[in-house]
């Protein structure tokens, strides 16, 4: 297939029709809104479903295993984006890959909606991991195809798109969480499946008219010989996994440990390859060296942020006073706090950085602030933990904890991908999105091992130790920021 030039793509996309933006933004906004609705809705109740007793409609895992499974699931979702990016570049193009990913996700939620089967759960996890890996890294790329690089609407277009992500994430726990916890878990998972179906319908009905050629390019097509070899390799791996599970060689515990190792090993291999590559010159290797402490800092940040959906979700279920003046809260509703605070504070941060202009903090300093705020979000939880494990505490403690970590996220996350693309060697530019996603994959791989300590040690020690480590790491990064900035060789 011949490569399609950017000019042809732009000409094929109607440039007006959605608040002054290309009409294709409507398609991608609502597709991603419903995909995030399905994902965050499912995630809001999945942990509870895993550890709820079977007589009450759950799968009956112990809490430590349930938290580890959630962390490994999250890690694999981010690892799978490497495969999703590769398939888009070599086989399907980004738009087709997004659509196929949505289909996998929908069937994954349908499998979860099947009552009382651990087999259905494992099948659903495979489908959702594969589907999210296909969709997540590619839908943003299609948004980029709608604009020229010089288009002044480009940044605001991405802002509108990310608003769709956060609106989906905000509404999902409230709707899916209520259905799942108040009525039936499988009804909640079914609602998540319907959400993804609506996203697919919007995409299918409006794609041809709104997206034109956007996302249809396959920049580096796979040869027939390579495709056959890859297909055979995938089949062999799948058979090996099935045999390992059936024979008891691959247990849940071993699988969790294996993914934890991969979550750390894959980024290390990435960095070794880039540092030893002859395609990277001295300046690029200096910038890459500057990126290493930022990468480590991001892993620390996401390790705390992602525990909002695991450890803090358990805390909300067991330790928070959920009855307020006769009004009953659902513990899953706390998962709406993160996107709610992002929607509220993201415009304020955007205004602040614009107002400060050249006086705004450098990227290493922004990372430092984000990591310190994440640490403080756990330090705050030490105070309610002092009341003992039997005491029910005010929900405001969790609200404050989520607020602090979101403020940190708004310092670190928006500049994370940007600085990754700037500091990665040019020869590896295609892998920059995957590099940034690997910070989250590594964080959740670590969480799978660390989170098991929550029930084994005092809560004050758990929150206090992790919070203190994060604050110290943020402080070290702050002290090193002038050195890191020099090594960045002019990159802001």
UniProtKB/Swiss-Prot annotation:
Recorded GO CC terms = plasma membrane
Q: Where in the cell is it found?
A: Cell membrane
Q: Name one GO molecular function term.
A: peptide transmembrane transporter activity
Q: Please give the start and end residues of each transmembrane region.
A: 67-87, 88-108, 110-130, 157-177, 185-205, 232-252, 255-275, 294-314, 333-353, 367-387, 392-412, 434-454, 464-484
Q: Which UniProt keywords apply?
A: Cell membrane, Membrane, Transmembrane, Transmembrane helix, Transport
Q: Cell membrane as a keyword? A: yes
* Keyword Lyase on entry: no
Q: Name one GO biological process term.
A: oligopeptide transport
Instruction: Name the major location.
Output: membrane
Q: Which InterPro entries match?
A: Dipep/tripep_permease, MFS_dom, MFS_trans_sf, MFS_Transporters, POT_fam, PTR2_symporter_CS
Q: How does it sit in the membrane?
A: Multi-pass membrane protein
Q: Which family does it belong to?
A: Belongs to the major facilitator superfamily. Proton-dependent oligopeptide transporter (POT/PTR) (TC 2.A.17) family.
PANTHER family assigned: PROTON-DEPENDENT OLIGOPEPTIDE FAMILY TRANSPORT PROTEIN, RESISTANCE PROTEIN MDTM, PUTATIVE-RELATED-RELATED
Q: Which NCBIfam families match?
A: yjdL_sub1_fam
Query: Protein name, please?
Result: Uncharacterized transporter YclF
Lineage, broadest ranks: Bacteria, Bacillati, Bacillota, Bacilli, Bacillales
